């Protein structure tokens, strides 16, 4: 098995077949919806809130609302009242089952539910998937997070419609330091490894530092990428604003941090300050344009044409050119 990450892989261009990069289609289908780009902001308290989710849905972007200090039932009701799709996160404990029951009692069925726990290859996830499939058979279930092909196979067999791959590669995640486990440092290899056995969409979660990493994720089998730090720190971001030496920052912290938990127990995340980057809409437009450019370099016109390109590994024992692997 090759071990590599985003910073030591480059994709090889093919003959361009478009007159303008704007001809390239960066959209992707997930469930019953098609979204403008294969990017979803991380479902974290300092990345998304209800107003951001409304804006994302109105503008054909995918979102997953976080599950912390939130009335999921009211959120789904609000989104449906606006005529928008509803995408929520659940854990695997009794209050999460209660949320499902409350939604059903009101006749509310979200379009997407992400079962979101740190170690998603677990019987508790299997049980929640089974409950959702029984009670809400039409909902699109995303489950995670996982790091191995065995986990992907199990989650798909249990009924997940998509799998979230990535344990601890994110900027504010310290799982690998606290536990010795995870995909930090080899996240892109994990995506490739998992995608080879997947029959349903893979969402690559974490470790994305540059816009070009989106194309690399697609090349190695992801359908979509989940991004935290690059989509935190915007003017609209819900993170607390902090001024340091006359420069404005927004706080950004991991879901398993003590800042999010409210206590120092089983902590696997940290808090950092992100420089304010401007408007979220501008960043998403730039991402779309960069993905269009990636598609043009791939010699294609559609997003999945990126999967046809060759690549090179920079440095290490695996250095060299790799042809359609």
UniProtKB/Swiss-Prot annotation:
<dbReference type="GO" id="GO:0006163">
    <property type="term" value="P:purine nucleotide metabolic process"/>
</dbReference>
<dbReference type="GO" id="GO:1902560">
    <property type="term" value="C:GMP reductase complex"/>
</dbReference>
<protein>
    <recommendedName>
        <fullName>GMP reductase</fullName>
        <ecNumber>1.7.1.7</ecNumber>
    </recommendedName>
</protein>
<dbReference type="InterPro" id="IPR005994">
    <property type="entry name" value="GuaC_type_2"/>
</dbReference>
<comment type="function">
    <text>Catalyzes the irreversible NADPH-dependent deamination of GMP to IMP. It functions in the conversion of nucleobase, nucleoside and nucleotide derivatives of G to A nucleotides, and in maintaining the intracellular balance of A and G nucleotides.</text>
</comment>
<dbReference type="Pfam" id="PF00478">
    <property type="entry name" value="IMPDH"/>
</dbReference>
<feature type="active site" description="Thioimidate intermediate">
    <location>
        <position position="173"/>
    </location>
</feature>
<keyword id="KW-0560">Oxidoreductase</keyword>
<dbReference type="GO" id="GO:0005829">
    <property type="term" value="C:cytosol"/>
</dbReference>
<dbReference type="InterPro" id="IPR050139">
    <property type="entry name" value="GMP_reductase"/>
</dbReference>
<keyword id="KW-0521">NADP</keyword>
<comment type="similarity">
    <text>Belongs to the IMPDH/GMPR family. GuaC type 2 subfamily.</text>
</comment>
<dbReference type="GO" id="GO:0003920">
    <property type="term" value="F:GMP reductase activity"/>
</dbReference>
<dbReference type="InterPro" id="IPR013785">
    <property type="entry name" value="Aldolase_TIM"/>
</dbReference>
<dbReference type="InterPro" id="IPR015875">
    <property type="entry name" value="IMP_DH/GMP_Rdtase_CS"/>
</dbReference>
<feature type="binding site">
    <location>
        <begin position="202"/>
        <end position="225"/>
    </location>
    <ligand>
        <name>NADP(+)</name>
    </ligand>
</feature>
<dbReference type="InterPro" id="IPR001093">
    <property type="entry name" value="IMP_DH_GMPRt"/>
</dbReference>
């Amino acid at each position: 098995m090759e071990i590599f990450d985003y910073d030591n892989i480059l994709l090889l261009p093919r003959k361009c077949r478009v007159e303008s990069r704007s001809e390239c289609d960066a959209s992707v289908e997930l469930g019953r919806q098609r979204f403008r780009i294969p990017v979803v902001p991380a479902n974290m308290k300092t990345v998304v809130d209800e107003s951001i989710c409304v804006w994302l849905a109105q503008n054909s972007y995918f979102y997953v609302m976080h599950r912390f200090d939130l009335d999921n039932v009211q959120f789904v009701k609000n989104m449906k009242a606006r005529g928008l799709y509803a995408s929520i996160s659940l854990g695997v404990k009794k209050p999460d089952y209660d949320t499902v029951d409350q939604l059903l009692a009101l006749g509310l069925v979200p379009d997407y539910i992400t079962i979101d726990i740190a170690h998603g290859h677990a019987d508790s996830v299997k049980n929640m998937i089974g409950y959702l499939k029984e009670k809400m058979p039409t909902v699109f279930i995303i489950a995670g997070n996982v790091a191995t092909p065995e986990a992907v196979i199990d989650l798909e067999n249990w009924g997940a419609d998509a799998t979230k791959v990535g344990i601890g590669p994110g900027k504010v995640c310290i799982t690998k330091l606290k536990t010795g486990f995870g995909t930090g440092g080899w996240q892109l290899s994990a995506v490739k490894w998992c995608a080879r056995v997947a029959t349903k969409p893979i969402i690559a979660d974490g470790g994305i530092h540059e816009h070009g990493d989106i194309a690399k994720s697609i090349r190695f089998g992801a359908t979509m990428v989940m991004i935290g730090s690059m989509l935190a720190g915007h003017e609209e971001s819900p993170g607390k604003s902090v001024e340091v030496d006359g420069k404005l920052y927004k706080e950004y912290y991991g879901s398993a941090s003590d800042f999010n938990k409210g206590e120092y127990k089983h902590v696997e995340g940290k808090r950092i300050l992100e420089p304010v980057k401007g408007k979220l809409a501008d960043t998403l437009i730039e991402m779309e344009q960069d993905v269009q450019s990636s598609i043009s370099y791939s010699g294609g016109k559609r997003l999945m044409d990126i999967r046809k390109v060759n690549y090179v590994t920079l440095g290490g024992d695996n250095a060299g050119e790799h042809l359609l692997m």
